[in-house]
């Protein structure tokens, strides 16, 4: 048997491949072009890394707080400090005491007391007065009621004294203010003495009538 011979394979090179090969061969032959190309590639990589780092830094940056700036004051309240004791005056006028290791001075206490008293006086001046003064005959009725009450008390003391001596079988000592008789009286006679009973009813009725007059006023 005879061996079959294979025809040789022909490879066709395109014009673009030949052009690239010629460029690469020309660049390899020129070392200056190779250095310039490497430098440009390095600059491109560096620029891209710097831009990426700046973007990441700006996204991760936190707002800084100025620690040296004093805090803003509250416009609703004002604080006044004297010595080691501080007072705070709020908008509605009430006093808030900030406690400290020392007590406020006497002058400060007096000042706050005067302010509180002035506020109370202003508040009372705005309130309507329900009972402005007393009725016209109130004073005279009160005087009459006190007189009748005093007469009633005197009569009760006199009767108790006569009752005491009647129990002891001894007459009481007569003076200018004593209307007791010299004759001996029994305890029952003293309790039911018509003179004492009449005077007692008179003084009691005077007190009751005066109280009614006061209520009518």
From Swiss-Prot:
A GO cellular component entry from the record: cytoplasm
Region (Disordered): 1-85, 167-189
Sequence ranges of Basic and acidic residues compositional bias: 38-48, 172-189
Biased composition (Low complexity): 60-78
Domain of life: Eukaryota
Note: Present with 1360 molecules/cell in log phase SD medium.
Protein known as: Uncharacterized protein YBR197C
């Amino acid at each position: 048997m005879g061996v079959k011979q294979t025809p040789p394979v022909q490879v066709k090179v395109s014009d673009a491949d030949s052009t690239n090969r010629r460029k690469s061969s020309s660049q390899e032959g020129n070392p200056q072009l190779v250095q310039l190309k490497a430098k440009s590639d390095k600059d491109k990589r560096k620029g891209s890394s710097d831009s990426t780092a700046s973007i990441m830094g700006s996204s991760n940056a936190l707002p800084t707080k100025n620690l040296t700036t004093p805090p803003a004051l509250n416009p609703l309240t004002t604080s006044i400090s004297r010595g080691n004791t501080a007072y705070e005056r709020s908008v509605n006028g009430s006093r808030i005491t900030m406690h400290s290791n020392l007590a406020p001075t006497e002058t400060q206490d007096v000042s706050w007391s005067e302010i509180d008293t002035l506020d109370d006086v202003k508040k009372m001046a705005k309130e309507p007065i329900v009972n402005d003064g007393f009725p016209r005959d109130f004073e005279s009725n009160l005087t009459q009621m006190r007189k009748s009450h005093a007469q009633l008390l005197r009569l009760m003391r006199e009767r108790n004294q006569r009752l005491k001596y009647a129990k002891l079988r001894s007459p009481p000592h007569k003076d200018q203010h004593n209307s007791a008789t010299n004759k001996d009286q029994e305890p029952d006679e003293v309790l039911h003495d018509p003179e004492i009973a009449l005077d007692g009813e008179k003084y009691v009725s005077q007190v009751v009538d005066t109280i009614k007059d006061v209520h009518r006023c």
